[in-house]
């Protein structure tokens, strides 16, 4: 692992904080009770635009319907630097002041190594928002594009390395959840990729347990269309930066998105119907039954995280 630009934040940690131990770089503003207040904090009702409301309320709907969060959760949010992950983190921060229980947030950023200083604007924003974080520079991107990667696609290898490291960080910091910023476009593209390439009828789970339930992978923005996320990111003035990966825009997912754009043109309402149908289907699939009894292996406990 390459040592990166985030090392200066290490000194922000109080001696008693568990985030200080171990390798890597982190700072703590609210990650534990020993370092300061954690979880939900009183906050005034800010005026939000329509796009911002869509993001915050849709995240709340996903949280409530699937029971993805509960009291005492410690949620690690994977922040890549794109609009999706920034809006996810901002929306969860707002929902801390809405839900009737306490949960904690920690941003996890793994710089892939193409531009080691690309995340320079992230740290001041996190400090301003009062969000704990772990930031590090890796070599995952260059490794995925090197001769070392003989068997897998570039995206598969890079994603596998990042996911493995994120799981390690969740274990180090005692996080119960890992939140990813996938949106409705990602759900639709994944559904058709699974159908056309693998012969499977499957999408992206909103709440999925790993390690015998020790960690839950969640996707609170899976009901939100990308256009609302982009608009909300601009309105919140989030410090989004460009993706420096040389393979960006040349992936199987981007090719599927282009194919789907042709499908959307078949009828006037094709896109709306496809999005509404698949998001409802995925939400129903990941929601526990009304009586609270759940026999499905992939669903989460029926806790409440909505309005």
Regions found by a protein language model. Name each.
Residues 105, 178, 185-265:
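Catalytic subdomain that performs nucleotidyl-dependent activation
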Residues 238-307:
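The feature marks non-catalytic terminal segments
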Residues 54, 161, 224, 251, ...:
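Conserved active-site and cofactor/substrate-binding residues in soluble primary-metabolism enzymes
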Residues 158-171, 204-213, 260-280:
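Short, basic, helix/turn surface patches
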Residues 114, 140-142, 208, 224, ...:
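Residue-level detector of flexible, active-site-proximal loop/helix-junction positions
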Residues 118, 152, 192, 196, ...:
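Alpha-helix boundary/capping detector
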Residues 5-8, 14-20, 27-191, 197-200, ...:
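ATP-dependent adenylation/nucleotidyltransferase module used to activate substrates
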């Amino acid at each position: 692992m390459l040592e990166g630009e985030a090392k200066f934040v290490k000194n922000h940690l109080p001696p008693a904080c568990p985030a200080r131990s171990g390798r890597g770089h982190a700072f703590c503003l609210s990650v534990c009770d020993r370092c300061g207040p954690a979880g939900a904090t009183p906050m005034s009702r800010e005026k939000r635009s329509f796009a911002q409301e869509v993001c915050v309320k849709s995240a709340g709907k996903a949280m409530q319907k699937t029971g993805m969060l509960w009291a005492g959760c410690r949620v690690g949010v994977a922040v890549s630097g794109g609009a999706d992950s920034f809006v996810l983190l901002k929306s969860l921060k707002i929902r801390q002041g809405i839900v009737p229980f306490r949960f904690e947030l920690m941003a996890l950023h793994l710089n892939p190594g193409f531009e080691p200083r690309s995340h320079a604007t992230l740290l001041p924003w996190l400090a301003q928002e009062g969000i704990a974080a772990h930031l590090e520079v890796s070599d995952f991107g260059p490794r995925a594009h090197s001769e070392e990667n003989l068997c897998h696609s570039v995206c598969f290898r890079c994603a596998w390395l990042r996911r493995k490291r994120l799981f390690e960080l969740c274990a180090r910091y005692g996080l119960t959840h890992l939140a990813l910023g996938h949106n409705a476009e990602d759900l639709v593209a994944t559904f058709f990729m699974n159908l056309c390439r693998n012969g499977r009828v499957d999408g992206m789970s909103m709440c999925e347990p790993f390690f015998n339930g020790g960690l839950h992978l969640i996707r609170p923005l899976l009901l939100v269309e990308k256009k609302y996320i982009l608009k909300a990111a601009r309105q919140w003035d989030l410090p989004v930066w460009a993706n420096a990966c040389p393979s960006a825009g040349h992936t199987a997912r981007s090719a599927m998105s282009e194919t789907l754009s042709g499908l959307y043109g078949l009828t006037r309402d094709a896109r709306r119907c496809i999005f509404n149908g698949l998001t409802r289907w995925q939400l129903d699939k990941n929601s526990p039954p009304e009586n609270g009894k759940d026999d499905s292996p992939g669903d989460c406990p029926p806790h409440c995280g909505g309005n």
